[in-house]
A protein has these predicted regions:
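Core dinuclear metal-dependent hydrolase active-site scaffold
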Residues: 2-6, 16-19, 94-124, 128-129, ...
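Active-site neighborhood of phospho(di)ester-bond hydrolases with catalytic His/Asp-centered motifs
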Residues: 26-27, 47-56, 74-79, 106-109, ...
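Active-site metal-binding motif and surrounding structural segment of the metallo-beta-lactamase
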Residues: 33-75
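Metallo-beta-lactamase
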Residues: 111-230
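Cytosolic catalytic domains that perform sulfur/thiol-centered chemistry
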Residues: 158, 171-173, 187-427
Length: 427
């Protein structure tokens, strides 16, 4: 028996590959499916099932491509209504994989189709719970994402989640290992631990949402308080996971179309494509293609793309390090941005050598800003979170959190000069 968590840090997402006696199952796979196929090939195993815990909002699953390439059956729990061929399991139904058994445990609340998979060994002992977004380490799934689909309020979904946890999960044995779909940094919860697995017994002791003396009213208040608005791309990812999408092979072929500086310029002017520069921010600031935006690939790339580029169908032209184009196209596709239509061959250096127009960002010190402010009225945009701004901010600065900068730009006077202020780091 093999249980492998395949964790992707930039999405704080855990997929799972489980193999026994020549058969395997993959749970909540990412968009690129080769890693799972390679593992099965190395084990001499066939992938029998692709288990989905729910229709994911924060990433596009690889379930459809993986099923096509491996012959596996896609399985969802009760209430799921996908537009493609899949098996909808009943609560309590069991699936054999080699010498292992997986039991479907329907746990509505995060979404109404949310389902956990209880793993039993050859002797029938319960050894693992693949809990999706129902139960995280230190937290539970937020109950506000499926309100429209479920025709329920977040309070009603929270009540449903409370019942699922108390009736379906908490009665299970303490020594079961919990394998969640996400860890710290995911927007699917608000207080996740940096740990990515734990025993259920320890979670009963330390996870606020599993407190034995907690009333339903207390639970509802706790899980619905302090929820930040979800990223705009979440419902679009749900739709793709439910209705289907282009194969990752098509997306990669389209995105890796090399364009000379001249052809790149024509494409930018004629297609309305967004120019996305994924180089290091410090390098970008020294020179970039006019009208491009910078989201560095070495960081929480996909979530920031989702926050700053509201339309997943937006055509994208890439400026990237030449040896990382495939990586960038793949990471965009993970969150549903499938319409990369080409990249600048030779990178920004080729653009510069071709004598094309170049923009730059000027950085100044706090002392320089203070000196300017002493002489004239200036306009400062503080792009930190509102909580950071309220804690302390530069006098007369206007708060425009980066997560919602598109909305803030509607209020910006294009005839004024703005000084942008942020804390240090990737953001």
């Amino acid at each position: 028996m093999k249980i492998e968590q395949i964790y992707t840090g930039c999405l704080a997402q855990g997929a799972y590959y489980i193999e026994s006696a020549g058969e395997a199952v993959v749970i909540d796979p990412l968009r690129e499916v080769e890693p799972y196929l390679e593992r099965a090939k190395a084990d001499g195993a066939s992938i029998k099932y692709v288990f989905e815990t729910h229709f994911h909002a924060d990433f596009v699953s690889g379930h459809i491509d993986l099923a096509k390439k491996s012959g596996a059956r896609i399985v969802y729990g009760p209430n799921a209504k996908p537009s493609f061929d899949a098996y909808i399991a009943k609560d309590g139904e069991e699936f054999k994989v080699g010498k292992l058994t997986f039991k479907v445990i329907h746990t509505p609340g995060h979404t109404m189709e949310s389902t956990c998979y209880l793993l039993k060994d050859a002797q029938g002992k319960h050894i693992g719970l693949f809990s999706g977004d129902t139960l995280f380490i230190g937290d539970v799934g937020r109950p506000d994402l499926a309100q429209k689909a479920a025709h329920m309020t977040q309070e009603q979904l929270a009540e449903t989640l409370f019942d699922s946890l108390r009736n379906k999960i908490m009665p299970l044995a303490d020594d079961i290992i919990v394998y969640p779909a996400h860890g710290a940094g995911s927007a699917c919860g608000k207080n996740m631990s940096k740990e990515t697995t734990d025993t259920l017994g320890n979670q009963k002791k330390t996870n606020y949402a599993l407190r034995a003396d907690m009333t339903k009213e207390e639970f509802v208040k706790e899980v619905t308080t302090g929820l930040l608005p979800p990223p705009a791309y979440f419902p679009l990812n749900v739709m793709m996971n439910k209705e289907g999408y282009d194969s990752i092979d098509e997306v990669l072929e389209r995105g890796q179309h090399a364009l000379s500086p001249a052809a790149f310029e024509v494409a930018a002017n004629e297609t309305g494509a967004l120019i996305l520069d994924t180089r290091d921010p410090q390098v970008f600031a020294k020179g970039f293609v006019p009208n491009s935006i910078n989201i560095g690939i070495d960081g929480n790339f996909a979530p920031w793309v989702g926050a700053l580029v509201p339309d997943v169908k937006q055509a994208i032209l890439l400026v990237a390090e030449p040896n990382r184009v495939e990586e960038v196209v793949t990471r965009l596709a993970r969150v549903g941005y499938d319409y990369t239509i080409g990249f600048l061959e030779g990178g920004f250096e080729a653009w510069e050598k071709a004598g094309k127009e170049v923009d730059r960002i000027k950085s100044i010190t706090a002392e320089e800003l203070a000196a300017i402010a002493a002489k004239e009225e200036i306009h400062i945009l503080d792009v930190r979170k509102n909580s950071e701004y309220l804690s302390e901010h530069v006098e007369n600065a206007e708060n425009a959190p980066l997560d919602y900068v598109n909305e803030s730009m509607l209020k910006v006077d294009k005839n004024k000069t703005y000084y942008v202020h942020c804390a240090g780091g990737y953001r």
